[in-house]
């Protein structure tokens, strides 16, 4: 706050008279009134005028915001793909892969009521509608190790006898082989246990007929299984007959299961 004072001016008196008059006046007159004062409040500091953003800066901010949103969305997309690939597909693959076994009475053996055990690895492809089975070397004999494909799209079954390293193809027998969905449900129901309930075994006999040169016509699944291997077509015998020892030497057996029972596939006339 600034204080400004004004002193009153004296006019019309000259010389000594003026001095005496002023002295007497000052002696007789009452005390002088205080000088007039004006109080001034200091002016507020002026603020700089509002600075408007330039047009170029506004556009740049929008661009940075857009780029940030794009990066965020891309991160969400990649995270979703990662979760889908490494968690969902992995879980789906585990649900479609089975390592299982079955206990059965071997009625085909010369020894009566022989209890046997068969293990196999099963992969079921529901969307492609085919099954792939791997039969390892049996612990107690009774068959050859093999890879088997049941292609329900083509209506074909392929056996890869690992001991002979040869492929054999025949029409799919739907009375024995469960479709992928049904087989998957069966294995899921018994997944809590290691083995299926004790069951029995049946036998089917097949005969080699001709060599297959065009493997691509068999479909991509069987082609990849039999590529680079001698491949032959099979014909199923309509009537069962007892096989003597001489004929048995020319037959190879593969034991497997795609149902609630075990199947022994005899492939005779092996080249």
Swiss-Prot record:
PTM comment text: Type I membrane-bound, as well as soluble, furin has a pre-eminent role in ITM2C proteolytic processing. PCSK7 and PCSK5 may also be involved although to a lesser extent. The soluble form of PCSK7 is incapable of processing ITM2C. Fails to undergo shedding by ADAM10 and intramembrane cleavage by SPPL2B.
Keywords: Cell membrane, Cleavage on pair of basic residues, Disulfide bond, Glycoprotein, Lysosome, Membrane, Phosphoprotein, Signal-anchor, Transmembrane, Transmembrane helix
A GO MF term: amyloid-beta binding
Pfam families: BRICHOS (PF04089)
PROSITE patterns (alphabetical): BRICHOS
InterPro entries per the UniProt record, alphabetical: BRICHOS_dom, ITM2
Residues glycosylated per entry: 173
Gene3D superfamilies: 3.30.390.150
Domain annotation BRICHOS: ranges: 140-234
Subcellular location: Lysosome membrane; Cell membrane
Membrane disposition: Single-pass type II membrane protein
Swiss-Prot/TrEMBL site (Cleavage) positions: 246-247
Subunit structure: Interacts with BACE1. Interacts with APP. Interacts with STMN2.
Stated role: Negative regulator of amyloid-beta peptide production. May inhibit the processing of APP by blocking its access to alpha- and beta-secretase. Binding to the beta-secretase-cleaved APP C-terminal fragment is negligible, suggesting that ITM2C is a poor gamma-secretase cleavage inhibitor. May play a role in TNF-induced cell death and neuronal differentiation.
Protein name as annotated: Integral membrane protein 2C
Biological source species: Bos taurus (Bovine)
Lineage: Eukaryota, Metazoa, Chordata, Craniata, Vertebrata
This protein's encoding gene: ITM2C
């Amino acid at each position: 706050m600034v204080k400004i004072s004004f002193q009153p001016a004296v006019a019309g008196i000259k010389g000594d008279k003026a001095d005496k008059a002023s002295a007497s006046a000052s002696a007789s007159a009452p005390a002088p009134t205080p000088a007039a004062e004006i109080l001034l409040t200091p002016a507020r500091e002026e603020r700089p005028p509002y600075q408007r953003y330039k047009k170029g800066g506004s556009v740049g901010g929008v661009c940075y915001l857009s780029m940030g949103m794009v990066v965020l969305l891309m991160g969400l997309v990649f995270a979703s793909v990662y979760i889908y690939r490494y968690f969902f597909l992995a879980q789906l693959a585990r649900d479609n892969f089975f390592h299982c076994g079955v206990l059965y009475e071997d009625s085909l053996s010369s020894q009566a009521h022989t209890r046997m055990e068969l293990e196999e690895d099963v992969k079921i492809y529901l969307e492609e509608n085919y099954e792939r089975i791997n039969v390892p070397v049996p612990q107690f004999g009774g068959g050859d190790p093999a890879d088997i494909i049941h292609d329900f799209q083509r209506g074909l079954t392929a056996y890869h006898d690992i001991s002979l390293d040869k492929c054999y193809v025949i029409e799919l027998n739907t009375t024995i082989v469960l479709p992928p969905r049904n087989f998957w449900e069966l294995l899921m129901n018994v997944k809590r246990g290691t083995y299926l309930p004790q069951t029995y075994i049946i036998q089917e006999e097949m005969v080699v007929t001709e060599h297959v040169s065009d493997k691509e016509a068999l479909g991509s699944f069987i082609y990849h299984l039999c590529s680079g291997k001698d491949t032959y077509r099979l014909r199923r015998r309509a009537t069962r007959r007892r096989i003597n020892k001489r004929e048995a030497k020319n037959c190879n057996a593969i034991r497997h299961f795609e149902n609630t029972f075990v199947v022994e596939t005899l492939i005779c006339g092996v080249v």
